[in-house]
A protein has these predicted regions:
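Intrinsically disordered, low-complexity Pro/Gly/Ser/Thr-rich segments with frequent PxxP/GP/PP motifs
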Residues: 75-124
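Hydrophobic core residues within well-ordered beta-strands of beta-rich domains
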Residues: 47-49, 68, 97
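Asparagine-centered strand-capping/turn motif at beta-strand->loop junctions
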Residues: 55-62
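Single-pass alpha-helical membrane anchors
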Residues: 1-21
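Low-complexity, acidic Ser/Thr/Pro/Gly-rich terminal tails and inter-domain linkers that flank the onset
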Residues: 18-47
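Terminal connector regions
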Residues: 107-167
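Short coil-to-beta strand junction motifs in C2/discoidin
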Residues: 63-69
């Protein structure tokens, strides 16, 4: 009886190990990246930034990814992040999928702590936005901004390297 139980436990452990290694392999073959980080809107509340995350699944198996949380930093200092959602997206084998748009609100009060004389710069920022020149808008602020995201790929935590929006 003990031999049967031992064989069953060894079989279950082996099956579990194979599953974990396969999940790790699929996660390693999956690449994730930020797509088109941009300023979407400028209001009295602050700057509204948007971005998408692209998932490139080069494996033969489908991948489950949670909706990423996008974080905005300046020189490594946390500024704000998108709202976390309990949403899982299945990425089909050998395909590229863009995950829903993430929106981040960067309040003027947060920017005030980073930018001296921000009040004098706001008119130039608004003028740049009205002209449709978001790159110039970020240059007007004079604040280095980076974005990164965190997610779970097949249950394994993933954090992207920071992407400079303005450096």
């Amino acid at each position: 009886m003990n031999k049967v139980l031992g064989i069953a436990l060894a079989g279950a452990a082996l099956y579990g190990l194979v599953r974990i290694l396969r999940m790790q392999n699929v996660s390693d073959l999956t690449t994730l990246s930020l797509v088109n980080p941009r300023v979407h809107q400028v209001t009295l509340a602050g700057l509204f930034l948007r971005t998408e995350v692209a998932v490139n699944n080069t494996s033969q198996d489908s991948v489950k990814v949670t909706k990423p949380v996008v974080t905005l930093t300046s020189k490594g200092k946390f500024l704000t992040q998108s709202v976390a959602e309990n949403k899982t997206i299945e990425i089909l084998p050998l395909s590229v999928t863009q995950i829903d748009t993430n929106e981040i609100v960067l309040n003027w009060s947060v920017l005030t702590s980073l930018v001296s004389n921000l009040l004098q710069r706001i008119p130039a920022v608004v003028a740049s936005f009205k002209k449709g020149n978001s790159r110039n808008l970020l240059t007007q602020l004079g604040v280095p901004l980076e974005m990164y995201f965190t997610t779970y790929v097949n249950g394994l935590f993933y954090q992207s390297p920071p992407t400079k929006i303005l450096g």
